[in-house]
Amino acid sequence: MKVSANSDIRVVELFAGVGGFRVGLERCSERFKTIWANQWEPGQAGQWAYKCYSKNFGEDSHCVNADIATVINQVPPHDLLVGGFPCQDYSVASTGAKGIEGKKGVLWWSIYQIIQKNHPNYVLLENVDRLLKSPASQRGRDFGIILKCLQEEGYGIEWRVINAADYGCVQRRRRTFIFAFKNTTKQYERMTSCFSADAKDGRVLSLIHISEPTRLLSIS
């Protein structure tokens, strides 16, 4: 599946909340078109996040209010998969946190099934910085599993921990962002081309471009 330079980029948004990923992508470029989204909060009769999402984006929200595990086969072909999957089970502050084996931690496997079914060109995921060390009993296991799953499906991966406070937010909020790209993309070609003399000399290219933190910018 190839995306031409001028065509729309079909986006699927999982664990959509009130639409944070969608807003960010649409502000970035009109090419990003969310064609399907999912938001479901177990045990919450009000489903307020889903209602807020639907109100914000109207009839074109394309948001399904159902358990993600029950609608995997409904996810249409897409170019970019995004999602901020639940973070509660990745807390290393609690020795009882089960990480990827926890009640909400297992939702990673729904993401993985969707990737296996559709193989989008790009995947962008977000979670707490503690994901890197989860679970407390076996530090780094969960993050390693996620990276290995993506690698086995033919993806190259980059990741970053970004603090929202560095970009004008009034609170410290450190989040892990995982960017995966299929081995058929130009991004993958760029990554693999780094494993040459440049890589040996420490000049490996980064595919994730991050603006300078707000606190480092001069005020005009």
Features from the language model and the residues they span:
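Conserved S-adenosyl-L-methionine
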Residues: 65, 155-166
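Residues that flank catalytic or metal-binding motifs in active/ligand-binding sites
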Residues: 146, 158, 172-176
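Conserved hydrophobic/aromatic beta-strand scaffold that supports enzyme active sites
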Residues: 82, 159-161, 177-179
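Conserved beta strand-loop-helix elements of the APE1-like EEP
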Residues: 170-188
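Short glycine-biased active-site loop of nucleotidyltransferases that positions the nucleotide triphosphate
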Residues: 73-75, 168-171
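Single conserved hydrophobic/aromatic residue that forms the stacking wall/gate
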Residues: 208-220
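Core alpha/beta nucleotide-donor-binding catalytic domains of modification enzymes
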Residues: 2-122, 128-143
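Conserved Class I S-adenosyl-L-methionine
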Residues: 140-157
